[in-house]
Amino acid sequence: SNGGSAYNILMDLTKLEAPFRLEAVGLVGNDFNGIRIVDHCREAGIDVRQLQMIPDIPTSYTIVTSVKQTGKRTFFHHRGANSLLDMDHFDFRISNAKIFHLGYLLLLDRLDEIQPNGRTKASFVLENAKKEGFLTSIDLVSEDSDRFTTIIPCALPYVDYLFLNEYEASQLSGVNLMEVTDPAEMDRRCQDVFKVIFRMGVSEWIIIHHPDGVWASHRDGRQLFQPSLQLPQEKVIGANGAGDALAAGVLLGIHEGWNMEACL
């Protein structure tokens, strides 16, 4: 099926009947998958003026394998057209949107490039969005590398809302949130994560999603926890897109002026 951060969030917002216009920005190949994505967005009423189809490179795709008993997933990703997404593909002046969401950092080769001044192109895209009056939001991808600390921090001063899972939070902050079973210990470690990442520059909220629930913290020190909804196992087909679904719901609430308790 179609997927990825931008597509999933747009479609989730469509299903949530978001009372505002949705816009897609990105690159797809001039192939079956690219045509299907653009057509589906159009059918959903999404503005595709900045969703460009380019020749001679395939649409990005991911093969996901999932262990049914544990839910553990392995991703095989081909970057394709996403690898060419660059600063000049974003024109914030023609957009009427309120929030700009960029995902996933660490999967967008040109935007992840570090420039001579030590900043990534993604950081400049986010800065430009802020200058045009947008609220900014980003999501990361889980990978086993040291790139979290070399690529992500320079973008965070231009980010209002940061979404990440427990693995990504661990990699970015250096505080281990993995396989923590004691709720009190998890709360304590999340507080440490928030302190580290806020020092990197996030302006508003950091939101960590985890199988047990969501931890969120505002720069002013407010902290929230929302437990997960426990569904019967037979109702769970898979976890793909779960983080994007959470982000879509939270972004809908932010757009409509809800407090974070209601968003979560």
Residue map of PLM features:
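Short, conserved phosphate/pyrophosphate- and ester-handling motifs at nucleotide-, phospho-/glycolipid
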Residues: L13, N165, G243
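Glycine-rich phosphate/adenosyl-contacting loop at the front of the ribokinase-like
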Residues: S1-E43, K72, Q233-A239
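Short glycine/serine/threonine-rich phosphate/pyrophosphate-binding segments
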Residues: S5-I9, N33, P58-Y61, D244-A247
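Ribokinase/PfkB-type carbohydrate-kinase core domain
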Residues: L27, V38-M53, I57, T65-F225, ...
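Conserved post-catalytic alpha-helical subdomain immediately downstream of the catalytic base
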Residues: V202-W205, Q230-L264
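Active-site catalytic pocket residues across diverse enzymes, especially alpha/beta-hydrolases
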Residues: E17, N176, I254
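A short acidic Gly-Thr/Ser loop motif
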Residues: G3, H210-P211, G241-A242
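Predominant activation on well-ordered alpha-helical scaffold segments within soluble catalytic domains
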Residues: Y7-T14, V38, S170, K195, ...
